[in-house]
């Protein structure tokens, strides 16, 4: 099997982060990037068109998904999972991609050695249907410059139980979700190649690793991970709150799934 990996996301008013997100993942071997924009008021469209024009070597697709969003909300359906399902179905039926990964624009798939490509990583576990990578959450830093690159020479990160999952394109796919997916007779592993531990009840269908596993491995770096830039800088953190969660049919002005510009007390202690 030829390994060919696609990356996909939904995004709202994230033009400031689109270039670094695209180039980061293109550098690690993702061969196509697709973004569905919703409720966008910034220059994301123009920016994506500019990147397409100046970087034809990167396959970039984007779509204005407002109509699809409204349809989901009117039917009380999850827009994010619906978008993922549409992208998955289309990619499976019309392309030769073998795998797909769904991330947000504040998430960066990263190999620890900063060299291994996503295809090379997958090739070490060719029989796996799904490979899950734990979040490493950035820590608050009031001295950090606004719009700093996602990585520097010194990175203090907290390992979180949540995962993001690269998955095979297969007709055995039963349900797509945000953190992991349900595949009939699927083989689910972690970044270290071991079987995904715990019961589906404890791990919420493999969306997060078990508590006992985290206690043992919370301070151990993985061969690959997903950097989750929840915090960035104070200004950026406050700005992110204003994007709300309209795609979840949550009409509140602010994001309600954030705890403040503080260390995450649900994650392991920060490590360099």
What is each of the regions a protein language model found here?
Residues 52-99:
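Active-site-proximal specificity loops/subdomain of glycosyltransferases
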Residues 23-32:
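Short, acidic, metal-binding catalytic loop of nucleotide-sugar glycosyltransferases
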Residues 31, 98, 129:
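Short acidic/polar active-site loop segments enriched in Thr and Asp
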Residues 37-53, 66-69:
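A conserved acidic beta->alpha catalytic loop
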Residues 97-108:
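Short beta-strand-to-loop acidic/aromatic patch adjacent to the donor-nucleotide binding site
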Residues 1-23:
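N-proximal low-complexity "stem/linker" segments adjacent to membrane-targeting elements
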Residues 77-82, 111-272:
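Catalytic-site signature of metal-activated, phosphate-bearing donor transferases
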Residues 6-8, 32-34, 59-61:
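A structural signal for isolated positions on well-ordered beta-strands in alpha/beta enzyme cores
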């Amino acid at each position: 099997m030829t390994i060919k990996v696609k990356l996909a996301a939904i995004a709202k008013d994230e033009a400031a982060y689109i270039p670094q997100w695209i180039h980061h993942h293109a550098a690690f071997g993702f061969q196509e990037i697709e973004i569905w924009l919703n409720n966008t008021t910034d220059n994301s469209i123009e920016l994506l068109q500019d990147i397409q024009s100046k970087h034809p070597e990167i396959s970039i697709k984007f779509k204005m998904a407002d109509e699809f969003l409204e349809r989901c909300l009117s039917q009380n359906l999850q827009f994010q999972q619906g978008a993922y399902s549409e992208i998955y179905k289309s990619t499976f039926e019309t392309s030769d991609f073998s795998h797909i990964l769904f991330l947000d624009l504040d998430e960066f798939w990263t190999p620890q050695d900063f060299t291994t490509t996503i295809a090379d990583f997958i090739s070490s576990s060719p029989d796996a249907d799904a490979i899950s990578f734990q979040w490493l959450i950035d820590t608050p830093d009031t001295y950090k410059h606004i719009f700093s690159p996602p990585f520097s020479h010194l990175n203090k990160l907290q390992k979180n139980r949540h995962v993001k999952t690269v998955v095979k394109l297969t007709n055995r796919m039963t349900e797509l979700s945000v953190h992991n997916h349900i595949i009939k007779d699927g083989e689910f592993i972690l970044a270290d190649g071991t079987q995904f531990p715990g019961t589906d009840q404890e791990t919420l269908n493999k969306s997060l690793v078990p508590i006992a596993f985290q206690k043992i491995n919370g301070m151990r770096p993985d061969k690959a991970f997903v950097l989750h830039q929840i915090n960035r800088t104070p200004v950026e953190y406050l700005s992110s709150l204003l994007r709300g969660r309209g795609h979840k049919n949550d009409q509140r002005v602010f994001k309600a799934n954030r705890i403040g510009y503080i260390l995450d007390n649900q994650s392991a202690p920060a490590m360099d």
